[in-house]
Amino acid sequence: MSKISYLQEREDMCKVAHYMWDRHLTNAAGGNFAVRVDEDRILISPSLMSERHFCELQPEDFLLINSNMDILEGTGKLSREGYMHVLLLTKFKNINATIHAHPMYCMVYVAQAKPIPNITEATMKRGPVECIPYTKAYTRNLHEEIYKYWEQRRELAETYPIGCIMPLHGVVVSGS
């Protein structure tokens, strides 16, 4: 294997992918995530991370991209949600990671397009996980709706992890 950049970050991302699967935070229907590793560098999980790999990834599986979504390292294909990850990671300087997933315990809310209320003191400061307007999956319109949701909560998003529900699809969360 040739030398790859950001090896420690990639190894950490392998653990996150494994945890996502093992803890039922996503399923074979999909899921993907990205981490900003430098000013104009983002590591992102490849397309079909869940469907083909069941989230068992190797460090070299992650793609290194720039803010134009050019693949700088890696041989895989970008996820259909790649633009959404890039949009949030480039427009919010305090957000360093984004995850799109299909968590088992959230999918009831997703299927009904219902917000997830706060139930613990620890989550009160973030507000509920609300729904964005229904938008067809894998489209720029969906990604723009997600960005609008974050923009409307900019101060909160720059301070705390937040998330939203994409009706009939899944969830998106961000954090530092």
Task: Place the predicted regions along the sequence by residue.
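Glycine-rich flexible loops
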Residues: 1-176
